[in-house]
Amino acid sequence: MVKIYAPASIGNVSVGFDVLGAAVSPVDGTLLGDCVSVTASDSFSLRNEGRFVSKLPDDPKENIVYQCWERFCQEMGKEIPVALVLEKNMPIGSGLGSSACSVVAGLMAMNEFCGKPLDKVTLLGMMGELEGRVSGSVHFDNVAPCYLGGMQLILEQPGYISQDVPGFDDWLWVMAYPGIKVSTAEARAILPAQYRRQDCIAHGRNLAGFIHACHTQQPSLAAKMMKDVIAEPYRTQLLPGFAAARQAAQDIGALACGISGSGPTLFAVCNDSETAQRMASWLQNHYLQNDEGFVHICRLDTAGARLLG
């Protein structure tokens, strides 16, 4: 039996729309991500478990893990009879890379079970393709960090889908999911088709400055550059309470605050545990909207998807 855990991820990280992503895991050891188990069988089967299993499609063939198995078998040129179990621990439409978790765990589990016939670049390419079936377009800002770990800059060049960006050991990422769903397609549709020149210049400056600050280990500069002029100004209207949370983050002393992916999850970066706890407490009391919501204090997950058994 092979069991793979794939961690949650922050798409965009404010400053890098569609080209930057970061994997995160709670500091308390909670598994914030999906697991897929594979065991040998006489015929294919897929069973769903986990806290958010009720949100999955009724038709098994619409389940992205089924599609991962189907695509992997196509790549291998044969049907591989296995019993799959998806532990859906991630809310769908949360902005935490939920579909990426399932895709990464599903494909990596099949690859491990079959003795790693596919290399990392090939497998990552397939992950982006499968993710595209869910979100409507091929993109790697969730699957790359989820699979490889840490913070990933998406390059999409032959042989270089992404490259690792060094993070900051002191940073704590407070993640708050309010318990409501935001459709990625809807969040994309709200964005303008064209941007003003000054916004393009600001975006280029912010992203270049952030990447430079990461590589030269200047955390205060990196935090200053974490500004989103591409998506956040438009998506805020889809996120009840985000503007108040961003102001609270500033008042409490967080280094930066932004939308995780297309939302509704937000993240706040803090450089000490006391500030992170205060931020988490505020979000727990003011940003969560129902019992499905949660807050986790996280660090960058540098390991990425990994074997649990």
Curated annotation (Swiss-Prot):
Kindly report the protein's main subcellular placement as a broad class.
Answer: cytoplasm
* EC numbers on record: 2.7.1.39
Q: Which Pfam families match?
A: GHMP_kinases_C, GHMP_kinases_N
BP-aspect Gene Ontology terms? threonine biosynthetic process
Mind telling me which Gene3D superfamilies this protein's record contains? Answer: 3.30.230.10, GHMP kinase, C-terminal domain
Q: Which SUPFAM superfamilies match?
A: GHMP Kinase, C-terminal domain, Ribosomal protein S5 domain 2-like
Provide the residue positions that the database annotates as binding ATP. Answer: 91-101
Keyword 4Fe-4S appears in the UniProt entry: no
Q: So what does this thing catalyse?
A: L-homoserine + ATP = O-phospho-L-homoserine + ADP + H(+)
A single GO cellular-component term from the record reads:
cytoplasm
Provide the protein's localization. Cytoplasm
Keyword list (alphabetical) reads: Amino-acid biosynthesis, ATP-binding, Cytoplasm, Kinase, Nucleotide-binding, Threonine biosynthesis, Transferase
Q: List the disulfide bonds.
A: none
Q: Which family does it belong to?
A: Belongs to the GHMP kinase family. Homoserine kinase subfamily.
Q: What does this protein do?
A: Catalyzes the ATP-dependent phosphorylation of L-homoserine to L-homoserine phosphate.
Q: What is the name of this protein?
A: Homoserine kinase
Q: What is the lineage of its organism?
A: Bacteria, Pseudomonadati, Pseudomonadota, Gammaproteobacteria, Enterobacterales
Gene name per UniProt: thrB
